Structures are given as structure tokens and as C-alpha cells.
């Protein structure tokens, strides 16, 4: 057992809560297969997006939490539904008109529009695996195409035939009348075209292991359900997979919630035990719409990592998985700064129970690196970048070194990366939107007061003292709401509606530099 077992078993951190559910479902016993199986799924119709990363990151958090509670071995598989027929051509791929010729073909039977792999599905799988590998996930990759064709599901597919009536009785009430007339859990792969067919099944034979359907010419075609000659509809497929692989834990997006009962019931019909399940909320774009691989309306992994460290992305995934969150570029700075705060709290905290409840414990699976930024946040660096418009990070380091002589790019690589990220983010998202407020006569009086205050203070004056002095100037100016006062200052001095704590910012930027900035507006 882990040395933190006692704290972990009492913890309300959601990965430990989920891990306890799994342990309870097993009654503390090792499963017959010898390990606890965690499964994530991937639909490779379009390029993997950040939500795909999120599901795997969260799954590993639960897996590692379970390993703190139990000595039972674990395994994580990532299952790709790459045998699904193409239903819609993604808008963000090259040569979409070529792909459109292969509608209803299994994704692994469509030529690779990127020209790199043996099929479109193989390319998408490779993209998924490359970034899972990049972030150090330990997993086994399962391809639906390979599982069906290799016979891994054959026993279960025969059982679906044997339980055909029971499964139909479960499924049919969920459809409209016209769909009821044509539905079958089996989708034959057309021997002539290779397409995944959604056709009525005229006859099924459990002993022979076959289904029969009518082709367009009216001919009866009999095909085996085994060996990759048929694919299950996605709802029965989900439940069948749970039973076949003996999955112990699965998480899925809210779009699956309405069908989760069906997955579980089909798993039971096929003699399996449904896994413990977590339904997470979907990410929304800045307009409140669901992000989609095929639409390409989300932040990609590469997008996020262009502007921020991977830990900030992992924190975004950790926070409130059952609550809908908007995922767009504006959330990046906030998550970087929250990560810095959680990291510092973790290393200052002596109470082990509080440490294992800290998000960074789960992000780093218990091995939390210590970072030092000397109180400099990502937001502060963005504001520094905004006033000095640096060509490269060495300009920012000039200010950082004056603020904290101990800090260097070599001894503080995290801070060095933040400086680089801040310049990129500023150039791409802030620079073009800067809009300065022309100071009124009232504002000029305030600016003169700030200038006088800066002229009177000593270089060693603490940030809090500077902040209080600026606060007092706002009070003296008669603002009913000091938020309006600071907003005016940010608009006049930075060209932005929001900004930093000015005391800390002035310490970083330098009193003399700040005086020049204020003088420039007078």
C-alpha cells in the first residue's frame, strides 16, 4: 500500500473519489484477468483535439489515484473506433473532395488525404498516439479494425446473435418509427464496395454465425458476423466492448450520457459487468458551442503549447470535469497563473492530506516539481511585454534581473519559458487590440499625483506600499468604485481594460521606467 493511503482514502479530490468507486466495485478483489482495466475512446473522423487529450489526462489521474489506494495492477487502453464508416467530411483536412468519394467506408479503408499513412484512419491514429507518447502516457493502443478482423470480438458477436431479440427489445423503443423498421445492431461490410451498410437484416443465424440482408438489386447476401465482415452499431458496440475486454472504468462526454444506460444493459445481456463510469461535461468554444474535431473550432494541443507550459493545460483538464467550461485562448493566462499558485502552495504545505488534495499532486502523479518565479506571474509578464514591446525575451530578462538578481534563464528555466510564451501571446492576441484612453483633466491630476509619489519613494520600497499609495490616490480622486479608477489607469497606461496589481508591476518594470510611462501620458 502507498504511504499516503490513509490521506488518499479520505480525500475528496475527484480522482481519489473515482478510484474509491472502482475499489468498491471490485470488493477489494483482483479481477480474474489479473488487472484493473481503464479505457478511453477516440473517434478518428477528424484530427485529435484538446478534449481527446483531456480525457486521457483525466483517466491517468484516476488510474494513478487508484494505484495509491490498491496494489492491484492496472492497465490503460486507448480504443480507436477506426472501423466506423465516414459519415461527414471534416472541414479542416486537405483534399476534402477526395475524401467525400469514400462516404460510408471504414476510416481505415479510405486513402490518407495527408499522404503519410496507409489510410485516413491510420493517419488519425498516428496523430493521437504521437501526442499521447509526447506527454508520457503509458497505454496500449487498440484499433477497432484490428480487433474485429483479428477475431478478438468474435465470441461476443456470436452472443449478440444469440441475444438478438433481447438486444432489439432494448434498442427499438429508443428510435422513431421509420428507424425501427430498418434498425439492426449489425452493420455488414459490403463484399463489393467495402462500405459499412446500415440495412435491415432479413435473417440471422446464431449457429451459422451469419446475417442476411438484401442488396440494392434485391439479392439476398449472407455474411459472417465474425472476422471483420460486420461491425456493430455504435451503441451495441460500446456495451459489447465493455463485456469483451472486461473494462473496469470508463469516462465519456455528456453527449454519451443519454445512451449510457443502453451501453451498460447490453454489457449485462452479453454476460459482462458494466464498468464504473464518469460523465464529464463538454468543452465549449468562445461562442458557447460544443468543440468538434470535424469543425476544427477548438484550441489544438499545439496551439496551447505555443503560449503556455503543458502543466497549465493539465490543470484546465483537472478542474471541475463535470462542469461545462469554455475553452478558448483567453483562458490560457489564468490557468498558467493558477498552476503557479497551486505549485507554490503544495511545496509550502506541511499537511499531507492537503497536499494530496492539491491539483498539482494529480497533474504530476505525486512527483511535483518545485518551480520558482519570485512572485512573477504570467499575467505580469504579459503586462510588462505590453509596455516595452520586446523583440525577444532578453528584453524581459533585463527587467526580471533588476527585480530579482538571483534569477537567470539558466537557473530558472520555467520563468524563462514564461517570458518566451508571454511575448508570443502578446503579439498574437493583445497587441492588435490595444486601445488607449486619452486622459481627461481629472486623469491628468491623478497621473501627476502618481508621478509625484513615484518621485518620492525609495528604490527599496515594497510592492504593497506602492500599491497602497496608488490606492490612496484613487480614493482621493473621489471614485465611487475603485475598479473604475484602476480600469482608467490600465486604459491610459497599458491600452487594456484589465491589468496587474500596479505595485508589483512597478517593482518589476522599475520606478524610473514607470515615471517615463506616466510622463508620456501627461
Swiss-Prot record:
Its EC number is 6.1.1.6. It is found in: Cytoplasm. ATP binds at residue 293. The keyword Transferase does not apply. Its main location: cytoplasm. One of its GO terms (molecular function) is tRNA binding. It catalyses: tRNA(Lys) + L-lysine + ATP = L-lysyl-tRNA(Lys) + AMP + diphosphate. GO terms for cellular component: cytoplasm. Coiled coil: none annotated. InterPro entries: aa-tRNA-synth_I_codon-bd_sub2, aa-tRNA-synth_I_CS, aa_tRNA-synth_I_cd-bd_sf, Lys-tRNA-ligase, Rossmann-like_a/b/a_fold. A motif ('HIGH' region) lies at residues 44-52. PANTHER family: LYSINE--TRNA LIGASE (PTHR37940:SF1). Belongs to the class-I aminoacyl-tRNA synthetase family. HAMAP family: Lys_tRNA_synth_class1. This is Lysine--tRNA ligase. It comes from Rickettsia rickettsii (strain Sheila Smith). The gene is lysS.
